[in-house]
Amino acid sequence: MGPSVAPHAVHTIANPGVSAAGLVAADHAVAAAIADEETRQRDSIELIASENFVSRAVLDAQGSVLTNKYAEGYPHRRYYGGCANVDAIEDLVIARVNQLFGSAYANVQPHSGSQANQAVFLALLAPGDTILGLDLKAGGHLTHGAPVNMSGRWFKAVSYGVDPETHRIDMDQVAVQARQHRPRLLIAGGSAYPRIIDFGRFRQIADEVGAILMVDMAHFAGLVAGGVYPSPVPFADVVTSTTHKTLRGPRGGFVLTNDANIAKKINSATFPGLQGGPLMHVIAAKAVAFGEALQPEFGAYAQAVVENCRVLAQALADGGLTITSGGTDCHLAVVDLRPFGVTGNIAEQALESVGITLNKNAIPNDPEKPMVTSGIRVGTAAGTSRGFGADQYREIAGLVLETLHAVRAGTLDAAGQEINKSVRRLAASFPLPY
């Protein structure tokens, strides 16, 4: 008789399948942090120009079961099975974005605006090629050739600036730089430029020197969609953008062109060149946002964004601050704080302490370091989504000025609580839809 074998111990273990518990029950730490962020958004005034409030429908799409689906490739040419539903969604979002902007071809897979720009670089440039873009110090973007960015490391980056008096793009300088350096790629667009860009003149300069013209409309795409800012699509060889900011969609990017050859190269550069599987839950949310932007009321929203920003900028100027370029044509304004003797980083911290969020920002030819700055950037896309109008933005300007005066006088500790009460009262009068 062989040795006895002890029976296997019986262990009671949890079901190894995926949990059906909601977030609060499953992960209190994450749920608590999200709840705190919901409170912050609900009770504060958002002036960050690159932020917005999406609709409940956009949130629902992004939080859907599409999170589970892999879909490498493009509609009807995938490397995975089970893609019929995501193919339908991606077909829809491409059709909608082309309808929205009057373009012939679109790639909606870039995970961000930066990756949309990288897709253009990979598709149309070779390492060492020359690119010409707006200087970061004049309101440009990191991805337009800043030395700390891959665009400034992989390519020979040259910049143009703004007129030192008007703070508007110096188109004569653009032409001079283009003739001297003969860039392969000429870039128009930026992250802190408040004026309308002359796309026709950029097209002329690009044609003169044989450059490809790329327009990065990440900041003003929603204004283009709403008909209150000129469209770059008829002028540019390729257009990139984010889907958030003024477009009021999820965080992501896209690329547009009317050139079939460029479109093919952009597709190959995006996948497999830069990315693997697309984020289909985000792409679904993009479809929802583009559908919303196609509605007539979105034009009224875009118009209100611009009008509100002009009111805000003028009220700040009336209070003694300087608005670079003398005003704004879009959703953002850059404010020079030097008349108050306050730096951008101090202003950002002080305003956040009373419930107003914005960002420190360099002014043209700023003498301060990037983490200090002489200015702040303000925007009206988010507040306008909330329902703020001209009266509210005049009040907000007053709260900003009151806070900065308190900083200068050293009385913020005493004044801050009352300012925050005013902020919370105003925010409560215009609740978020979720």
Curated annotation (Swiss-Prot):
Keyword rRNA-binding applies: no
Alphabetical keyword list: Amino-acid biosynthesis, Cytoplasm, One-carbon metabolism, Pyridoxal phosphate, Transferase
GO biological process: glycine biosynthetic process from serine; tetrahydrofolate interconversion
SUPFAM superfamilies registered for this protein in UniProt: PLP-dependent transferases (SSF53383)
Chief site of localization: cytoplasm
Site (Plays an important role in substrate specificity): H244
EC number assigned by the record: 2.1.2.1
Pfam families per UniProt: SHMT (PF00464)
Family: Belongs to the SHMT family.
Biological function: Catalyzes the reversible interconversion of serine and glycine with tetrahydrofolate (THF) serving as the one-carbon carrier. This reaction serves as the major source of one-carbon groups required for the biosynthesis of purines, thymidylate, methionine, and other important biomolecules. Also exhibits THF-independent aldolase activity toward beta-hydroxyamino acids, producing glycine and aldehydes, via a retro-aldol mechanism.
The protein's name in its UniProt record: Serine hydroxymethyltransferase 2
Natural source organism: Rhodopseudomonas palustris (strain ATCC BAA-98 / CGA009)
Gene: glyA2
